[in-house]
């Protein structure tokens, strides 16, 4: 049948012929099911749906007394696709993705903080009130800034993306500073009552660096000795060669008696 392969569509007919010819003793159990629900016979593949990014904004429209909620659809550029990529599923994008990328590009060290990745439904952020940044039962992290910025964009009239980002970032810095102060005060109070703490992370890192440097210095010394031995095997001992040169130079300077 040309380039089309109908083997999968005719699996029931093949099973019936094999049973009639005696190749199989009993018909398969799925024979009646395939007869009731036959395979699809559509030979034309449809292209995947294009997902559009929808944004919610609160804007003051001309002639309106109060701000109204407006839904904006981001226009996507139509790019010609290769034949091999024509039927691939399209990428699903959310507005939070762009906000998250911008925040972690400006604050890469926030990714080094420990985070809780366990979620019940994947929509845990919807159970918080993001009219404020700090939430009870949730640690302050970069995702809090993203959700706070998104809440400002969806609820504050005529606010820009950069303005919402500045507001959320300023609140984030203030809470981070408050956490650092509380941590320092708690450590000072504990030390005042007799508590002792081990070395800090910086001290541990410096100790590991010193150990690595000492290990490298011993390795470099051994390598230098091996290199000197290889050189001496071809040119002789450097002390003997230096002594011979000194003797020759002295003989040239001192006149030989007649």
UniProtKB/Swiss-Prot annotation:
Pfam families: MRP-S25. It is found in: Mitochondrion. The keyword Ribonucleoprotein applies. Keywords: Mitochondrion, Ribonucleoprotein, Ribosomal protein. GO terms for molecular function: structural constituent of ribosome. GO terms for cellular component: mitochondrial small ribosomal subunit. Belongs to the mitochondrion-specific ribosomal protein mS23 family. PANTHER family: 37S RIBOSOMAL PROTEIN S25, MITOCHONDRIAL (PTHR37799), SMALL RIBOSOMAL SUBUNIT PROTEIN MS23 (PTHR37799:SF1). Component of the mitochondrial small ribosomal subunit. This is Small ribosomal subunit protein mS23. It comes from Neosartorya fischeri (strain ATCC 1020 / DSM 3700 / CBS 544.65 / FGSC A1164 / JCM 1740 / NRRL 181 / WB 181) (Aspergillus fischerianus). The lineage of its organism: Eukaryota, Fungi, Dikarya, Ascomycota, Pezizomycotina. The gene is rsm25.
